């Protein structure tokens, strides 16, 4: 009885098993048939593909799978509905489409599309109104293209949208009132466009589903809504770099879900008032920088315990830092620079990761807790441009992971302590400029291989440069100007592979610059200022023959000159981005460069005791913008090769003993706006170029045999010419480049030098040579511009 029942039960189980298995197979087969892409969908996608000029030899990887022989539901970037087989998602981000979207595009035949992502596709032109026909879209991403026009009217029809991403294009126009139809919108990013808006208060309160809002870098000139508490899902709020006005948006901070707020770069004003901020606030990143907020830092800010990043810089805040800031136990990054804050710097700040308090009126340091001085946290400390005084703060020596230290423009005195060696291993920037530090620059750089920038200028340092600087293999800028350092020229710095800026001006350096055992000079130097020292001797004709960085243009380094006018030395990107600064004589005036332009090339040897000829090899430095050799004892003729310096803006050869003529070809240098040839022994005619004829008379004064100055100085001050002088002016140019040929031969070989020398024995070949030499010296620079 029992065995019979057991067999019956087993049979039932087996039957049920095969029934379920069969059902699953049938369902799978049926489902697989439905997965097939519909023909109309495939044809629409292929039509869309053919609208873009994709090379047959190099088809786009993402579109290479798109062909008639395969199921379009398995094409890359395509997703179909499981049941209907219709395309519901198209993601072609980073595919180089290189065209515009046509009104009749096959794309707009995909009526069931829910997700359309065409970011970074090199799309351009206006977006057609046909976009509004894709009524089922919930996600639209056209970011990072070159699209133009007024797109928002069409987008406003897409009332199912949850994500709208249009950032980094050139869209324009006002946000239409119909935009309020997008009530399901959760993420809105229209940043970095040219949208306008004068009444944000009408639009924003209706978008109650928003969790992320980014309208940064547009042309909005509105106030914020007085009541934003209805945006109860909001986490991210970014209105940076617009022209928003009004008072502090108190209601915004009553939203419990809020995590990130960026109000930077607007025209908000008045005191900072948080109101009844939620006790459960999740706000961790608050940026109110670059506005017109005034009054004190509110004590109530200490109640936002979740804060990690706080930036109140570039406002009109006054008074001390509230002691209650110590309650912000999660705070890691604090920037209060460029305000009118004063008093004591709280010691609790030394436990943070980055502290920026520059350009205020702080005058003392508060007591620090032992935990704040453990040396494990701080990476960046900027106390520049305050009223801090006394000896070097020794507690800084305990900060073992410092990457950037700026104590510039304060009242510190005494010596720089040797214990600073403890903080140099990770150090990338050390700025002690414009204090009253005295004594020797300590030998603390043995382990400072990461140091990019050292500026100790405008102090009272003496002695010699520490030889441990030779270990700073990443050094780009060394500025010891305006001290009383007495040493010979640090020729050993030639071995630093990245040194671009060397400033030794206004010290007591002495001796020669030229050493026989150093054959190739500073290959990467872009700017050198050794003015107002005691250097002496002659400069070899080959002295500048291998200063390659002054020969190579930014265009050749990077393959493109896009944006190079906005690049500055020292700006390295997110890991380290601190601009280098300097002071030097520019266009006859002592000028403070808060940032050093990336393209700037300059040589200032003025105010020394050099004599002999100016090296002809200076004519190789075709990227040079400034050349100042004034106040020396150079003799003989002005090199004809200077006419090759087509980017030269400033030339000062005054107060030497130069003779002969001013080279006629200098008159063709169109950028040469500032020049000085005064107090020499020059003769002959002044070149006729526009830049020469627009100079002040003092540019040529005390050269008694110069003539052609009637338009510049007036007839009463213009000496007359003689036929003899006119004949002397037609001197042969083949003397000019013998030294250049020798310089080239000196490096690559005698044969190259002889060939180039032969070329330059033919008159008027300078530009041809520079073009060829320039091309042969082309380098690829892998470091990013900053």
Swiss-Prot record:
Belongs to the RLP family. The keyword Transmembrane applies. The chain crosses the membrane at residues 740-760. Residues 31-739 are extracellular. The lineage of its organism: Eukaryota, Viridiplantae, Streptophyta, Embryophyta, Tracheophyta. It is found in: Cell membrane. One of its GO terms (biological process) is response to mannitol. Keywords: Cell membrane, Glycoprotein, Leucine-rich repeat, Membrane, Plant defense, Receptor, Repeat, Signal, Transmembrane, Transmembrane helix. The keyword Ion transport does not apply. Its main location: membrane. Induction: Induced by microbe-associated molecular patterns (MAMPs) such as LPS, HrpZ, flg22 and oomycete-(NPP1). Accumulates upon infection by the soil-borne necrotrophic pathogen F.oxysporum f. sp. lentis and associated with nitric oxide (NO) production; this induction is prevented by the plant growth promoting saprophytic fungus T.asperelloides. Induced by NaCl and mannitol. InterPro entries: Leu-rich_rpt, Leu-rich_rpt_typical-subtyp, LRR_dom_sf, LRR_N_plant-typ, RLP23-like. Glycans are attached at residues 67, 98, 115, 133, 181, 199, 206, 276, 338, 413, 422, 434, 447, 471, 558, 628, 644, 676. This is Receptor-like protein 30. Receptor for microbe-associated molecular patterns (MAMPs) that induces a BAK1-dependent basal immune response to necrotrophic fungi (e.g. S.sclerotiorum) in the presence of MAMPs (e.g. flg22 and SCLEROTINIA CULTURE FILTRATE ELICITOR1 (SCFE1) from the necrotrophic fungal pathogen S.sclerotiorum). Functionality seems to depend on the presence of the receptor kinase SOBIR1 as an adapter protein. Required for full non-host resistance to bacterial pathogens (e.g. P.syringae pv phaseolicola). Disruption phenotype: Reduced basal defense leading to an increased susceptibility to the non-host bacteria such as P.syringae pv phaseolicola (Psp 1448A). Increased susceptibility to S.sclerotiorum strain 1980 and to the related fungus B.cinerea. Impaired SCLEROTINIA CULTURE FILTRATE ELICITOR1- (SCFE1) and flg22-dependent ethylene production. The gene is RLP30. GO terms for cellular component: plasma membrane. It is a single-pass type I membrane protein.
